[in-house]
Amino acid sequence: RSDIIVSILPDTKNTKNFVNSNFLKKMKKSSLLINIGRGPAVNEVDLIKHIKNNPSFFASLDVFNREPLIKKHKFWSNKNITITPHVAAITDHDSSIGYLYKRFMDFKKNKKIKSDVDIKLGY
């Protein structure tokens, strides 16, 4: 039983809602679901219910059934869900170090962090 499950499933008729209530029930109550594949692989309604019933369960989502994620979607207000703006890709470590360092220094100086998720814009 894994602490972390990463979904990289494509969007096919066989993978639609693959991660549903039945799948989630089999996971540890204190685990993390990461979806970087395609949004329709995760049943969003089932995920919300599962998190509500299992407060130690978390999800990190880069893809959704509908993109961009609508402003009133329940994911935005759920503290157990981390949303990333559909940026999963191969990382160039040399360039990412400078990128992260700059943002960290801005954070330390209480400056606005550039390129963060803007809930008002929906991404």
Model-derived regions: residue spans:
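Rossmann-like adenosine-cofactor binding region
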Residues: 1-74
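C-terminal helix-to-coil terminal segments
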Residues: 67-123
